[in-house]
């Protein structure tokens, strides 16, 4: 349950030097390039579970959906589809629990005003690693910067470990 709940906590990492643009209606910043999305998501997520999510709301378009894929007992994939408000309510229920998602490795593909970011992550709750997985993020360029249109997440499991190529320097740890 914990990896499924938190695998939605999306991306992390410190990306220095990416220019940011003002986000609509929240006083937050939007990335000026798709490669800045992981750092923007990290900043919007990291902190107490019940913190204000205005920056996360500014980063995702209103119609954005988050899909959490998991494997059932029979190994068949299942999914849960949520709005950002659904996700915020689930995370907020954890109270002051500290959340932190650390990006392990990512790459970005861009064509014109659309981009896809494929990112592996490790998720921490109160300093303890509770999950790892992959985030598939779609984004669009708007006048104020890049915004997320959708996120699909699958947490690592015993039958679906993270491949070496998605870990820093190819490590399996």
Residue ranges and their predicted role:
Residues 4-17:
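Bacterial N-terminal signal peptides
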Residues 22, 26, 30, 65-66, ...:
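Surface-exposed, charged secondary-structure patches
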Residues 60, 70-72, 119-121, 135, ...:
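A mature extracytoplasmic/lumenal domain signature
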Residues 132-160:
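Short beta-strand edge/turn micro-motifs at domain boundaries
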């Amino acid at each position: 349950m914990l990896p499924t709940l938190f695998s939605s906590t999306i991306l992390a990492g410190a990306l220095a030097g990416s220019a940011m643009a003002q986000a609509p209606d929240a006083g937050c910043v939007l990335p000026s390039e798709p490669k800045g999305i992981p750092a923007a998501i990290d900043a919007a997520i990291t902190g107490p579970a019940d913190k204000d999510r205005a920056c996360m709301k500014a980063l995702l378009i209103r119609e954005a959906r988050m899909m959490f894929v998991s494997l059932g007992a029979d190994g068949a994939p299942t999914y849960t589809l949520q709005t950002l408000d659904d996700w915020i309510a689930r995370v907020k229920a954890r109270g002051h629990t500290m959340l932190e998602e650390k990006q392990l490795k990512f790459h970005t593909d861009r064509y014109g005003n659309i981009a896809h970011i494929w990112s592996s992550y490790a998720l921490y709750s109160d300093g303890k690693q509770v999950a790892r997985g992959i985030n598939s993020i779609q984004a669009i360029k708007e006048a104020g910067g890049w915004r997320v249109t959708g996120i699909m997440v699958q947490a690592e499991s015993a039958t679906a470990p993270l491949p070496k190529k998605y870990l820093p320097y190819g490590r399996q740890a």
